[in-house]
Amino acid sequence: GTLIPGFYKEPKENHTAYAYTYVYSPKEQNVGLWAEFQNYGRSEADLPPLPGKWDYKESRIWINEQEILPPVWTATHRTKSNEIALGNENCVARPPLEVHLQKGWNKVLLKLPVGKFVSPEVRLVKWMFTTVFVTLDGQKAVEGLIYSPNKTLE
């Protein structure tokens, strides 16, 4: 089939990508955050992340210089199997994390390192991320937020 191009034309091992944006909030508020750095499917016998880690690549996220730690993973198995149900590895399968947005601009920074594109823990090492601010119940996007890497309100 046809390959869909990624951001990097020739991605290299042992590199780190950074992604950032600013989010304008019209008011100080607590919102939900869905974040993930590896999307899991049970067609692969991938292992869930280790406790306290987002993934096996050491990805990290900060909002306004405060690191956002991952949730407690419900799947804790250490043996690869297609027969073990997914837990809350994928962001839409868990309640969003509660995070604080200040009134005005909020900096969101992601660190996305890749050592190797092969791993004993996951078959398809994905250089990807999802970062979405949602209502605390996870039902919809937060109204009134403006996303801009240049801090423009347009």
Label each PLM-derived region with a short phrase.
Residues G1-K27:
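Extended carbohydrate-recognition surfaces in non-catalytic/accessory domains of CAZymes
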Residues A19-G32, L97-K103:
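Extracellular and analogous surface-interaction loops
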Residues T21-K27, F37-G41, V114-K116, T135:
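Beta-strand elements of well-folded, non-transmembrane domains
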Residues K27-P51:
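A short beta-strand element within beta-rich, extracytoplasmic domains
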Residues L47, G52-F129:
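Beta-strand-rich ligand-recognition modules
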Residues L112, T131-G138:
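Short beta-strand-to-coil "C-cap" segments at the C-terminal boundary of structured domains/repeats
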Residues K140-E154:
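Activation corresponds to long, low-complexity, non-globular regions
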